[in-house]
Amino acid sequence: MAVSSATASSKLILLPHASSSSSLNSTPFRSSTTNTHKLTPLSSSFLHPTTVLRRTPSSTTTPRRTFTVRAARGKFERKKPHVNIGTIGHVDHGKTTLTAALTMALAALGNSAPKKYDEIDAAPEERARGITINTATVEYETENRHYAHVDCPGHADYVKNMITGAAQMDGAILVVSGADGPMPQTKEHIILAKQVGVPNMVVFLNKQDQVDDEELLQLVEIEVRDLLSSYEFPGDDTPIVSGSALLALEALMANPAIKRGDNEWVDKIFQLMDEVDNYIPIPQRQTDLPFLLAVEDVFSITGRGTVATGRVERGTIKVGETVDLVGLRETRNTTVTGVEMFQKILDEALAGDNVGLLLRGVQKTDIQRGMVLAKPGTITPHTKFSAIVYVLKKEEGGRHSPFFAGYRPQFYMRTTDVTGKVTSIMNDKDEESTMVLPGDRVKMVVELIVPVACEQGMRFAIREGGKTVGAGVIQSIIE
C-alpha cells in the first residue's frame, strides 16, 4: 500500500474498515447512534408466521415498535453468484422508485418478489416526509446473478446510514435526475462511496421524461462523467443508462407481466440491469479464511433464542459450529443453531452473504451491534493500536483546520463507532509531531474507550461532526 508518497494522497481514502485483501466489509456504525431502523428480511425468517419480534433496547429513547413477520419459505438454492449492490444519490432523484421498478421488472421475468415503493420506504417517519432514513435490503435475480440490493437514503441528515449500506456494496447504481443534474448530495455520495471502498458504479439518469431537449441530457451525462473522474472513478468508461423509474413503475403496476420489448421505459430498467451484470464484476469472496461476521442488528425470538444479522466478511459458517462473540464486552462462546438468508434456510453461509444467525444460550442483552462473531481464537478485542492514517483535505470533505495529540474523534470499525483518543503522532519521516494538517499522512497511536475486535491490516474511518475526516489502516496492535 502506497502510504509514503505524497502523490498517493487520494488513494488512501479507500481505507475504512476490514483487512487489506477485502475492499468491502460490514457497516461502520453502532445502533446507539441511530434508532430509526426498519426490519430487514435477514432475521425475519426464523419466526413462526405470527411471531412478534422485539428489538434490543438502545441507549436512545425512541418509542418501541413491534413487528409481525413471516416464517421461512423453503430452502435457499445457491444456483447463481451472489452480488451486493445498492442505490445512492441525491434526495428525491428517484432511488427508491428505481429500486421498486427493478424488483417489479425482474419479478415479471420470474426472478424476484415484487416490492412496491411503500414496502421499501416502510418506516412511518420516512414515508411522512417522502425521504428514506434507513437502508432497506431487497433481493432479486437476473439471468446470471442473485442480487441483494440496499436502498440508501439520500438526505443529508442521514449520511451516516448511507455509509451503513454502502460499506456492504460490491457496486452501486448512482441515480441522478436528468432534469436537475448532479446536486450536492450526488457529490457527497460519490465521495462516501470512494471512502468506504465501493469499487464500481453504474449511472441511471432518471426523469428522462421531464427533459425536453436531448442536448440537456447529454450535458448532464458529461457533467456526471467529469464528477466521477474527479473522484478517481473511471468516468469515461462508466455505463450510463437514461430512463424514467416512475413511468416504468407505473407501467409495471398496471401490468405486472410486462416483458422485454413491451414498454420503452421498462426496457430501460432491463438495460440498466444488463449493464450492472456486465460492468460490476463478481467479487472474489474470502471463503478460505476463518469465519468472521460483524453484528449489525440483534433480535430476540421467544422460544427460539437470539438472532444476530450481518454480512459474512470472510470464511463460512454452518449450523452446529461454535463461534466467539468478541468486542465491547468480555469474549464468550456460543453455538450457531440456525442460518438463514432472505427468509430461506441455508446449509452454509459464505463470505459476502447477508445472513441471520440463531445463537444458542445468548440473551439479547448479551450481544449488540459492533461485536463480531468469529471462529474461536481467531480474533481478540483490543483498545490500543498504531495506525497509518490519511487525513482528508477540505476539498475531499474533511476538516478545514489541523488537529493535535489528544484529539478525540469517533473511530468507525466494521459496524461499530467508538470514541478514541489520539495519544501520539509521528510524521512520514518517523519524527514525533504534535499537529496534523488536512492532507497529511501520519502514523498515530490510538486508545479506544472500549475494547473492539480488531487486527493488523484492518481499515477504519475517522469521523467528527457528521463527516469523515480521515481513513486509516491498523499497523500493529499494542494492547
From Swiss-Prot:
Residue range covered by the transit peptide: 1-71
Stretch list, region G5: 244-246
Glycosylation sites: 333
Renumbered residue ranges of the record's region G3: 151-154
Ranges for region G2: 130-134
GO cellular component, one term: mitochondrion
Biological process, per Gene Ontology: mitochondrial translational elongation
Binding site for GTP: 89-96, 151-155, 206-209
Residues covered by the tr-type G domain: 80-284
UniProt-recorded Gene Ontology molecular function terms: GTP binding; GTPase activity; translation elongation factor activity
Annotated region described as G1, given as residue ranges: 89-96
Ranges where the record places region Disordered: 19-43
Keywords: Chloroplast, Elongation factor, Glycoprotein, GTP-binding, Nucleotide-binding, Plastid, Protein biosynthesis, Transit peptide
InterPro entries in UniProt: EF-Tu_GTP-bd, EF-Tu_GTPase, EFTu-like_2, EFTU_2, G_TR_CS, P-loop_NTPase, Small_GTP-bd, T_Tr_GTP-bd_dom
Record localization: Plastid, Chloroplast
Low complexity bias (residue ranges): 19-32
Region annotated G4, chain positions: 206-209
UniProt feature, compositional bias: Polar residues: 33-43
Family: Belongs to the TRAFAC class translation factor GTPase superfamily. Classic translation factor GTPase family. EF-Tu/EF-1A subfamily.
Function comment: This protein promotes the GTP-dependent binding of aminoacyl-tRNA to the A-site of ribosomes during protein biosynthesis.
UniProt-recorded name of the protein: Elongation factor Tu, chloroplastic
Organism expressing this protein natively: Glycine max (Soybean)
